[in-house]
From Swiss-Prot:
Substrates-to-products reaction catalysed: tRNA(Pro) + L-proline + ATP = L-prolyl-tRNA(Pro) + AMP + diphosphate
Keywords noted in UniProt: Aminoacyl-tRNA synthetase, ATP-binding, Cytoplasm, Ligase, Nucleotide-binding, Protein biosynthesis
UniProt subunit comment: Homodimer.
Gene Ontology CC entries for this record: cytosol
Domain of life from the UniProt record: Bacteria
Name used for this protein in its record: Proline--tRNA ligase
HAMAP family: Pro_tRNA_synth_type2
Task of the protein: Catalyzes the attachment of proline to tRNA(Pro) in a two-step reaction: proline is first activated by ATP to form Pro-AMP and then transferred to the acceptor end of tRNA(Pro).
Places the protein is found: Cytoplasm
EC number(s) reported in the record: 6.1.1.15
Similarity comment text for this entry: Belongs to the class-II aminoacyl-tRNA synthetase family. ProS type 2 subfamily.
Signal peptide: none
Length: 438
């Protein structure tokens, strides 16, 4: 994308309403614009980040056999009355009526709808297990929306649901999903620590939340450093083998990790001092096992091996996709702007032409840009070099390819790595190879 053609409305001034770094930087960098209290429009660069996160989630969910569906944002109130949650959920649920006076709601979650869909289609234990997921916008009417997309009223979420014939099968599904989540977060460039959690209004008796470490996190966290040091991407786990999943799960649960709500000083004292880690965390994911809570309350049955009907066991698994954008920025920024992990950055690199209309500079920039115009941002504006440097740092592109007249004459460019500030003088070919665009 050429910056002269891009819709990239950056702000020079810090918005007064923005209280935390991610909110300030998302507004300043032109990723989002607020349209109402707690509701944001996603602009092109921000949408590219969302799509990159979605793609990683899809790849990892598909890898464990989950299948993608897409459910509507509006749900029938009758489904929620069947589960008993319509009146219990509280004022966070946005309730509406259509022109015929039928009660609807803007879904804050999808347990009821997916259970109804499953129950209308699956009739035998032979069709189990099943895992379904979707990525959809949701709405919760927060009393005090704040911190930008971190606590908005409308948000993009990936939620998945598993259905199993037994408790043992459901626990295997739960562990499989935990591994998928840990792989997702590592690929996104953040370290999310899994911690035992309350089940809240979802219900159930087994739950973990995943928290990204950041100074502005809502929760105090206490955990064993071993959890932060794990390489989940290289861990060999057979997701179809219950014993392999149990071994993996033990590597998580054998190490202490808790938020302030669940913190146990006696257990914390058992962690060696050199492995103790304390800080604050932002919740970006939550997984639940709740047995037959919804299948029983909604009358969903399948036939077992002996022909007798039974209620399948369920799990529910959520990732805050739009919240992750804010969490990644909170965990990875500096005074100059965002520092995107390469896997989610809106563009692989920014090409900074320091001398517009210089024949050598233009030729090199055009050559580099032509290798991958979809994933390179070419700053071809007639602006001062300082403006281009500042905007590139603000936007947080992993690499900056700086093309000036002196280097251009020698066929050289300067390559700057945003995360470290390191600079390299390289040939065009070597620069492209280093950023992975060759």
């Amino acid at each position: 994308m050429r910056l002269t053609k891009a819709f990239q409305p950056t702000l020079k001034e810090v918005p007064a309403e923005a209280q935390i770094a991610s909110h300030r930087l998302m507004l300043r960098a032109g990723l989002v614009r607020q349209t109402a209290s707690g509701i944001y429009a996603w602009l092109p660069a921000g949408l590219r980040v969302l799509r990159n996160i979605e793609q990683i989630i899809r790849e990892e969910q598909d890898a464990i056999g989950a299948q993608e569906v897409l459910m509507p944002t509006l749900q029938s109130a009758e489904l929620w009355r069947r589960s008993g949650r319509y009146d219990a959920y509280g004022p966070e649920m946005l309730r509406i009526q259509d022109r015929h006076g039928r009660d609807l709601l803007y879904g804050p979650t999808n347990e009821e709808m997916i259970t109804d869909i499953f129950g209308s289609s699956v009739k035998s234990y032979k069709e189990l297990p099943k895992a379904l997921y979707h990525i959809q916008w949701k709405f919760r009417d927060e009393v005090r929306p704040r911190f930008g997309v971190m606590r908005g009223r409308e948000f993009l979420m990936k939620d998945a649901y598993s259905f199993d014939a037994s408790y043992e099968g459901a626990v295997a599904s739960y562990r499989r999903m935990m591994l998928s989540y840990l792989r997702i977060f590592q690929r996104l460039g953040v370290r999310a620590v899994p911690m035992v959690a309350d089940t809240g209004p979802i219900g159930g008796d087994l739950s973990h939340e995943f928290l990204v470490l950041a100074p502005t996190g809502e929760s105090a966290v206490f955990f064993d450093a071993a959890l932060e040091e794990q390489d989940w991407l290289s861990r060999p786990v057979d997701c179809d083998d219950a014993e392999s999943l149990a071994t993996f799960f033990a590597t998580v649960t054998d190490h202490y990790a808790a938020t302030d709500e669940k913190h146990d000083e006696a257990e914390w004292a058992k962690v060696p001092a050199e492995r103790k880690r304390e800080g604050r965390g932002i919740e970006v994911g939550h997984i639940f096992y709740f047995g037959t809570k919804y299948t029983a309350s909604m009358g969903i049955e399948v036939s077992g091996p002996d022909g007798a009907p039974f209620h399948p066991h369920m799990g529910s698994y959520g990732v805050g996709v739009s919240r992750l954008v804010g969490a990644i920025i909170e965990a990875s920024h500096d005074d100059a702007g965002i520092i995107w992990p390469a896997s989610v950055a809106p563009y692989r690199a920014a090409i900074l032409n320091l001398r517009q209309d210089d024949e050598a500079c233009d030729a090199i920039c055009d050559r580099i840009y032509g290798t991958d115009p979809e994933n390179l941002l070419y700053d071809d504006r007639s602006e001062r070099a300082g403006v281009k440097f500042n905007d590139a740092d603000l936007m947080g592109h992993p690499w900056q390819i700086i093309v000036g007249p002196r280097g251009a004459k020698e066929g050289k460019v300067e390559l700057k790595q945003r995360a470290t500030g390191e600079r390299f003088e390289l040939s065009v070919e070597d620069a492209l190879a280093k950023i992975g665009a060759a």
